[in-house]
Structure formats: C-alpha cells, structure tokens
C-alpha cells in the first residue's frame, strides 16, 4: 500500500480544508502541512483531479485512473477489464483511422459476428464464423492506422506510455513535457470519451499470448492460489484479472462497449499529475477538455462480500518447473482500514532486508535458502504472505514451521522495541524518496483514489505511525495471525492445467504505416512555447568547503525533503589494485572490533541509513544515504567500519 508521509511535525489534528485562489473559479481541497501541497479538485461532472507541483524537471507525470478492474468483470466475460485496457490504445473516431465513416459498418459487422460466435458451440460452425470475422477484419484494417496513439504521444514528447489493470483499478500513464498539457488533455479526453474498438481479433491474439504465458508462471500460479484460498467468495479469489480461457475464447464487443459506457465515466475517474505546471491554468485546461464528459448517475456498486472466518489452514498445491517453495498467507482488512498502519509496520518488523525477524533469524543464520514477507495491498481486503525456498535436505514443511515460529515470536512480543522505532524511521525514509519522484507522487494520488482513502489521512500517516506502541503490534498480531492461513506448496512437476489457448489463424492486417489522420497532423502542427534549458553552474550552485584533513567537500542543500546523500570519492580503483572492488564490496559483510555485522546492520536500519559501493577503474565511490536527522551518527558508524573493519567469524 502506497502512502504519503508528512515530514513536518503535525502539532494539531489534520483537518481537510477547502481553499481557493481568488483568481480561479475552481475550488479545491488541501491539507495543512502537506509536503506535496496537493490540490484536489472535483469537477461538476464528478471527475477528481489531483495536482502537486514539482519543478525539479520540466516534465509532468500523468495518471488517469479508473476505479474498475478485474473484480468488476462479469462472470461470463472475465478478463474484460484487462482486455479493454489493450483496446484503449486503438484510437477513436478522430485518430487511428483514415476514414471512420467507411470503417464503421465493417466494425459493426464484426461486433455482430462475435455475438453469434460466442453463442455457437459447434466447432465447425465456430470456425466458419471466425473465418468471416477474419475476412471482414482484413477489409476494416484498410481504413485503420495501427499505433497512431503512439505517434500522437511521440509528437508531444511523451515517455512511458503504458497502462496496467489490477483487481481494483485500470490506470493509464504518460510522462509529458511541461509545455504539452493542452495537447495531452485534448488527446486523452477524446480517447476516453470516444474510444473505438478496432483491431479486435488481432489484439485478442496478444491477450491469448499473455494468458498462455501466465499458465507457465509459477509465481502467478502461487499468487492466484493464495487468493483463491483466502477469498473463496470474493472476486479476488473467484476470478483472475486475465480471465479464464473459456471466457477469453468467447469475447463480446457488445459487453465491452457496455462496460466502457458504465465505468469509464468522470464520476468514476481521477486525473493525477505531478510536475512542473501552474495548477490554476492546468485545471482550466482539464475542465476545458474533460468537463463536458457525462457522468453515470447509476454507477453500479459491487455487493459487499463478507468472507467467512478461516478456521483451519487451507492447503493447495501448485506444480511447475521452478524450484520448490512454500507460501503462507493471511487475510486482513482492506487498504482503507484503520488497521492498515499496523499491518504496514508489522510487515517491516517481520522482514525489512536488514534487521527484521526473518532477516536476523532465518536469512543471516542461513536457516533457509531464501525468504521474504509482504502484503498484496488491495482495496476490499489485504493479504500478508511469507514465502521461502528450502535448503538442500530441507522440506517445505521445515520452512513452514520456521515461518510459524517467527509469527509466534511476533505474537509474544519477542522482539526488541527499538525495531518498531526503526521500522517507523525506514517507513519515513521510503516516503521521503517517493516525494523526490513525479511518478511516485502521482501514484500516491492513484492509491488514495482507488482505495477510497481521504488525503488528510495520507498526510497524517507518519503522525499516526509515531504513536504506535509495541503492545498494539502484539495485540494486532494475536488478533489476525492464527491457523487461519493459506498454505501453498509449490512443487516441481508437470502442471496438468498448462493447456494453452490455441490461437486461431488470422490474415495479416494492412498496417498503413505511412498514413496519418487529420487529428495527428493537427497535433503535430501546434506550436508550443519552448522549454528553456537550465544548466548547472558549479560556481554558483555548489558550495565548496575544505574539511580539517584538507579533503575538499562539494555541498548542495536538499530543499525537497529530509534525506541526505553523501558520496566519498577515493582516488583509487581496479587499475591500482584488481582486488579493490572486491575489498570495498566486502565491507558490507564486515563488523568491527566493537560491533558484530548483525549489530552494524541493525544500527544502520535503526538510523534509516545505508551505504553502497561503486568501484571503478580509477576511482571508487561509496554512497551513504538516509534520514538527514541521523546523518552524523551514520557517518560516525560508517567511518568506524572504514577504520576498524574486522571479519565477523560468527
């Protein structure tokens, strides 16, 4: 679950406050002491717009999130949300086509034939119908311009064109130059309002391939087995985002159109942006292009599914070619639950890569080959999982028993209270890093919107975390961790369910690579104000100091967040000594005469700091990073290692 953190001390209860510039007719909500200074608008048609300004680079990360995903798929057409995500790149009446008036009758015929096809059971008849679909699709392709959406994005200098579908959401991503907001909004509004389903059967082939690949992915099979065990009555467990083979072989364009008209409406969408822009001007542009979209006053609501308590382990077995492993999973409340904070901290205490229970007791003591723990993070329910691979001569049940022993330690409070403080510090560090990145900042908005979390609660998270006690963690663990878990054995062997979907033969379509729509030409012809480059001036932008030992120091204050980054540059590398790189890398595994490696790892984790080594031919770079407030202690600890490195014989 992605959260936003406030690194300013919140001395008062955070209240969501309405604010509005006198110069703008658009009212927005904001939260005091929000480090992102987010503005949250709601247009008259219900469209949510989340804006945060970050002028580090002249670019803007945009996400358009739709609150619909695999859990909303009709039972007879599972995989629909994911499939439609693919079709959103096929164009509209204005682009992706040379002549929509000529193309439309053919597309209508294809839609009607697919309705007949999906209801036909005789294989010979189905084959004949699909042949007709293929023939008409070829004729329709003469009018289509495949990949013109990509050309539009290239025309405005966009990067990272992509989309993803989960159980709870479908999200469309673009990273655009700061001077292309108008063009971007114009294209996206047309795309979301006037989507045309073309290239259907060829895209179906792509979806088939994705499904076929999933059938041989042992990790995905384990994931789906965990969900089916924990959520036997909820769509999380009863269906998958990719859909069943049977449903994918019987698609319905009519159902997909109804799906678009039902869910892809402004009162079920959010535009999330982070970057270099004027929020007052930006909301005007968004309203100009998206403000006329019609909401759905009858937006469906999924029936609330109350899962029955799990009273004994639900055991499942997965077969595949990957190495054997075992996974345990427990069910928890969803992302908007007040207990989400406790779950996040519990996850850090159990496994953080440095000083968690699994790290210290199992990984560092080499009791298993490998292991990890974490959460799935979904809106309606959450899941906490532990997964591990056995050593040679060890059974999957041995690993399971080791996991359960660690859970018992958690429930008994058999862990240092300082681990909780350290977990909070590291959670704070993680969120600080996210403030540095436009993609992460905008993604926080997406998570809040999809999970139904008020922004004030996101901003106040660190304040809440700082008040959590060890006893609360222990009580939480005893409340949720019992014999109520999913137990998935991943064993080596041939999976009898790996029956791939046969792809029907299709005629290669006409690509029309050199064609362009009028819409694309109009976008290409738009003149925008150029972005003026800003160059680093070493004399003005960097402060130069000299340490007591005459070592030169270059310094630049971090004005974005409370994270420091310190680089030690050693004028020696592998050209001086071939063992140099290995020697510096070995530092990560050394203790000192006063501290063991375990103690050093725990102290770095407590400080929410870490170091990395980058050996080069002529220089070696050592990077020390972490919370600014702990920089002196982290430097002292690191320099203690440099001065007194010792092999930890234990």
For each feature predicted by the language model, list its residue ranges.
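Bacterial Sec-dependent N-terminal signal peptides
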Residues: 1-25
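Proteolytic maturation boundary segments
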Residues: 20-51, 278-319, 325, 329, ...
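M16 family metallopeptidases and their MPP-like homologs
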Residues: 52, 57-70, 79-81, 97-190, ...
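Metal-associated gating/positioning segment near the N- to mid-region
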Residues: 75, 87-99
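Non-catalytic, conformational "gating/processing" segments within enzyme and secreted inhibitor domains
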Residues: 204-205, 219, 223, 253-289, ...
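Short, conserved secondary-structure transition motifs
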Residues: 208-216, 305-319, 423-434, 624-627
């Amino acid at each position: 679950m992605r959260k936003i953190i406030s690194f300013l001390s919140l001395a008062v209860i955070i209240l969501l406050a309405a604010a509005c510039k006198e110069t703008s007719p658009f009212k927005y909500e904001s939260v005091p002491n929000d480090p992102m200074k987010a503005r949250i608008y709601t247009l008259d048609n219900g469209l949510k717009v989340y804006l945060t300004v970050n002028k580090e680079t002249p670019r803007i990360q945009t996400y358009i999130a739709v609150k619909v995903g695999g859990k909303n798929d009709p039972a007879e057409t599972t995989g629909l949300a994911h499939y439609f995500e693919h079709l959103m790149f096929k164009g509209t009446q204005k682009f992706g086509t040379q002549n929509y008036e000529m193309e439309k009758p053919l597309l209508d015929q294809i839609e009607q034939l697919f309705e007949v096809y999906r209801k036909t059971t005789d294989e010979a008849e189905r084959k004949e119908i699909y042949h007709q679909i293929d023939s008409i699709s070829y004729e329709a392709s003469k009018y289509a311009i495949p990949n013109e959406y990509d050309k539009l994005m290239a025309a405005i200098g966009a990067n990272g064109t992509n989309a993803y579908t989960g159980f709870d959401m479908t999200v469309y991503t673009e990273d655009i130059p700061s001077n292309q907001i108008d063009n971007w909004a114009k294209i996206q509004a047309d795309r979301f309002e006037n989507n045309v389903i073309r290239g259907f059967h060829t895209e179906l082939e792509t979806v088939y391939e994705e499904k076929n690949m999933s059938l041989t992915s042992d990790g995905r099979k384990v994931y789906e087995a965990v969900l089916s065990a924990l959520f036997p009555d909820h769509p999380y467990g009863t269906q998958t985002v990719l859909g069943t083979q049977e449903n994918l072989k019987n698609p319905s364009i009519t159902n997909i159109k109804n799906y678009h008209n039902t869910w892809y409406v402004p009162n079920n969408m959010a535009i999330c942006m982070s970057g270099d822009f004027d929020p007052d001007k930006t909301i005007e542009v968004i309203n100009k292009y998206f403000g006329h979209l019609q909401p759905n006053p009858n937006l469906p609501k999924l029936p609330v599914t109350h899962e029955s308590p799990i009273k004994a382990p639900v055991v499942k077995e997965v077969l595949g070619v990957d190495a054997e492993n075992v996974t345990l999973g427990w069910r928890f409340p969803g992302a908007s639950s007040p207990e989400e904070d406790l779950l996040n901290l519990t996850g850090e205490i159990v496994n953080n890569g440095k000083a968690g229970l699994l790290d210290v007791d199992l990984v560092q003591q080499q009791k298993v080959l490998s292991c990890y723990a974490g959460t799935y993070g979904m809106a309606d329910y959450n899941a906490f999982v532990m997964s591990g691979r056995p050593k040679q001569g060890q059974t999957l049940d041995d690993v399971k028993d080791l996991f359960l022993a660690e859970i018992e330690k958690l429930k008994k409070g058999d862990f240092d209270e300082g681990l909780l403080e350290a977990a909070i510090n590291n959670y704070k560090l993680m969120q600080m890093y996210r403030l540095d990145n436009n993609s992460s900042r905008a993604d926080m908005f997406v998570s809040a919107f999809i999970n139904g979390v008020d922004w004030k609660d996101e901003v106040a998270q660190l304040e809440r975390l700082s008040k959590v006690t060890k006893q609360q963690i222990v009580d939480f663990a005893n409340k949720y961790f019992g014999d109520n878990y999913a137990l998935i054995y991943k064993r080596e062997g041939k999976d009898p369910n790996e029956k791939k979907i046969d792809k029907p033969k299709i005629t290669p379509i006409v690509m029309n690579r050199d064609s362009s729509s009028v819409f694309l030409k109009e976008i290409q012809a738009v003149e925008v104000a150029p972005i003026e480059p800003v160059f680093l001036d070493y004399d003005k932008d960097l402060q130069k100091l000299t340490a007591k030992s005459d070592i030169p120091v270059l310094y630049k204050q971090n004005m974005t967040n409370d994270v420091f980054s310190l680089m030690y540059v050693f004028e020696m590398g592998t050209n001086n000594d071939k063992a140099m790189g290995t020697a510096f890398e070995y530092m990560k595994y050394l203790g000192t005469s006063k501290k063991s490696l375990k103690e050093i790892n725990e102290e770095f984790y407590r400080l929410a700091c870490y170091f990395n080594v980058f050996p080069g031919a002529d220089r070696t770079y050592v990077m020390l990073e972490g919370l600014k407030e702990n920089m002196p202690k982290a430097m002292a600890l690191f320099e203690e290692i440099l001065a007194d490195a010792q092999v930890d014989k234990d």
